[in-house]
Amino acid sequence: MRDVASVQPLAGDDPDAAAALATHVGADLTIVGPEVPLSRGVVDRFSSAGLAILGPTQAAAALETSKTFAKAFMARHGVPTAAYHVSESAEDAVAFLTSGEFGFPVVLKADGLAAGKGVVVAPDAATAHAAVTSIMRERRFGAAGDQVVIEQWLEGAELSYFVLSDGERVVPLGSAEDHKRVYDGDAGPNTGGMGAFAPSPRCDAALERRILDEIVAPVIAGMRAEGHPYRGFLYCGLMLTPAGAKVIEFNVRFGDPEAQVVLPLIEGDLTRILAGAAAGDLRSHSVRLAAACTVGVVLASGGYPDAYQTGKPIEGLEQAGSIPGITLFHAGTALGEDGRLVTAGGRVMTVVARGHDYAEAMSRAYQAVDCIRFEGMHVRRDIGVKALK
């Protein structure tokens, strides 16, 4: 990134510091990536200072920052989702689980932000009760676990669908599928995402039309009707059930690693489109998606998603980047004291390959992955396999 941009140090959870930096550098437009600044009102802070920014307000961001708000909102506006129960105490949660109303498996979600780790799919009562203890009694996620949403388990295939909204209109950005579990074969604990591919082969034109009409349109209209017009990226996490697509979750941002596989497929002047959304006017904007496929593989630090190692030198990036169709998206990286690039987070980077089909994109992605080395590096070796079936 340093080759094409000025990298500025910034505490991402401080709206005042972000606004001060935008003013200092004369930013024409700020695009918010993570959910934490949105939850703390960075868009409201910028707007009050007359600074252009793309993202939902703090109130609109509740679609992601509060599972209880999102479920109640969907109920109010007829958006299809799983049946649910909200518990405000561990005792109530245990009592509801014991009632057997939803049976097992059952899904438990911490109400607030938990870095993608606040969801437990419990196959039995013992696992469900352990999740209640962890979230509500042991306070694993702090205040995010003040409430727990218990959801009826939905059976089907998952996909993610993305749009950009100006508060009234939307521009579709297509679909993707991600791999949340840490190990091959979707084994192990959930993570923020170990890889993704786009577009989803499940999302044909008919399904896309239903998603836009039955899910996206009611959400955008509902937010506007409730006084919180939604501007920015909306990520719809969906389950394709026999009864149709149902919402599992919303993200009020593009999502990671989904953004990395969708962005390389967007053709045209993306900057103009983003500026139009931020200004509340997408009337003359549309997006053309390339007739290609992408596969993105996350390189994770040893120990992730639990306690992980950092400060490990990274090698092989130049060789990986020379492979046709490869883009390297940095995440948890930093410059060490000796000027070498080192690991600085759980998910270190995403290697994205574009190809004519999924097989070519997958082959290129893993060819590039095998060029990169750092101590303890962990990758899944099956990212994209689902698209080949």
Spans of features found by a protein language model:
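Short acidic-hydrophobic, aromatic-tinged amphipathic segments that line or gate anion-handling sites
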Residues: 7-13, 85-89, 122
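ATP-binding N-terminal substructure of ATP-dependent carboxylate-amine bond-forming enzymes
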Residues: 1-58
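A conserved helix-loop-beta module that forms one wall/lid of the active-site cleft
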Residues: 54-118
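Active-site "cap" helix and flanking loop/linker of ATP-utilizing ligase/carboxylase catalytic domains
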Residues: 212-234, 251-323, 336
